[in-house]
Regions:
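N-terminal accessory segments
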Residues: 1-23, 255-260, 284
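N-terminal glycine-rich flavin-associated loop
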Residues: 1-16, 35-76, 88-121, 157-164
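Residue-level signal for inorganic ion chemistry
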Residues: 20, 190, 249
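Short active-site-proximal "capping" loops at secondary-structure junctions
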Residues: 21-25, 38-39, 146
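Conserved glycine-rich FAD pyrophosphate-binding loop
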Residues: 27, 185, 205-289
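FAD-binding subdomain of flavoenzyme oxidoreductases
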Residues: 74-75, 80-180, 185-189
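Short amphipathic alpha-helix segments
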Residues: 161-181, 200-206, 223-237
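Terminal amphipathic helices with adjacent charged low-complexity linkers/tails
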Residues: 191-204, 208-211
């Protein structure tokens, strides 16, 4: 995908921000706002890879992959680039892994207005892979992603949410490859995928009941240690992702002090990638949840 026009729009001098579908923010007053290229360039089912513009809505990408019976491990909200920028893995992270592992190659524009390619186009080629990982979750402060090559996965033949009142911490180790395990202090939701017979057999073995999709509180996304999860009971409405360390809470995430070593590493990275601070000015990556 040709990113020359995208790079020209970004330029190399004045402050600039990037926006997707405005699901996590929109244009900033007084600052030029750009949008990443849109569209699926190609799908290679035999290689289980796909290339698309970072501005492509995830739902559009899913539709393009449906014909080959594949999908990507990115939640169907917003754009591909937006999900990568905020490292939004979604509630299937337990089974699908973190969203950063989906990226094989990224084409991005740096603070100097140059197009840079990181990573490789196939699953076997991991050249520059660490730089792709660095961009994921950086919220556009190190570079603006223009296009990506993503690893696809087979679309599940069958999936079903189940519920139980069993202790999730005792049940979780006994489950076989659950896609998601959620808990609100009373009810445990379990998402199982696979062959219908295998899913039903596991549900019967653990006494699970078919349930509705869980509704997540929209107040804040907390990151906590697994040992702290029982202490959430009584703190307000929440849904915790068991085995992941993420909690969707009705209240905003508590402010925590940033590790000085982490802060220093971030400053060094920012100084190397964007010395003038022109990319997404005002975005605080360290305080983001």
């Amino acid at each position: 995908m040709d990113l020359s026009e995208f790079a020209e729009e970004i330029g190399s001098e004045t402050p600039v921000s990037i926006a997707g579908l405005a699901t996590r923010g929109g244009p900033v007053d007084g600052i030029q706002t750009v949008m990443a290229p849109v569209g699926v360039e190609w799908v290679q089912p035999e290689e289980m890879t796909v290339r698309c513009g970072a501005g492509t809505p995830v739902e559009e990408l899913d539709d393009a992959l449906a014909a080959s019976g594949q999908c990507v491990a990115i939640p169907p909200t917003g754009t591909v680039g937006g999900a990568l920028a905020v490292a939004h893995s979604g509630i299937r992270r337990l089974g699908y892994g973190p969203v950063r592992d989906t990226v094989l190659q990224a084409g991005y524009v740096n603070a100097g207005g140059e197009v840079v390619k990181a990573g490789g186009p196939t699953v076997k080629n991991v050249s520059g892979f660490d730089l792709c990982r660095l961009l994921v979750g950086s919220r556009g402060t190190l570079g603006f992603i223009g296009d990506v090559i993503l690893r696809t996965r087979p679309r599940a033949a069958y999936e079903q949410w189940f519920t139980t009142t069993a202790d999730p911490f005792e049940l979780f180790p006994r489950l076989y490859r659950p896609t998601s395990v959620l808990w609100d202090g009373v009810t445990t939701w379990i998402l199982l995928e696979g062959h219908p017979r295998d899913v039903d057999e596991q549900a019967t073995r653990h006494g699970l009941t078919i349930g509705e999709n869980p509704i997540l509180p929209s107040g804040g996304r907390w990151s906590i240690r697994p040992a702290e999860l029982p202490g959430l009971v009584g703190t307000g409405d929440f849904v915790a992702e068991i085995g992941v360390g993420v909690v969707h809470h009705a209240d905003p995430a508590p402010v925590r002090a940033v590790d000085p070593a982490v802060a220093e590493l971030h400053r060094r990275l920012k100084r190397e990638f964007d010395p003038t601070g022109r990319l997404n000015p005002g975005v605080d990556v360290l305080s983001a949840t």
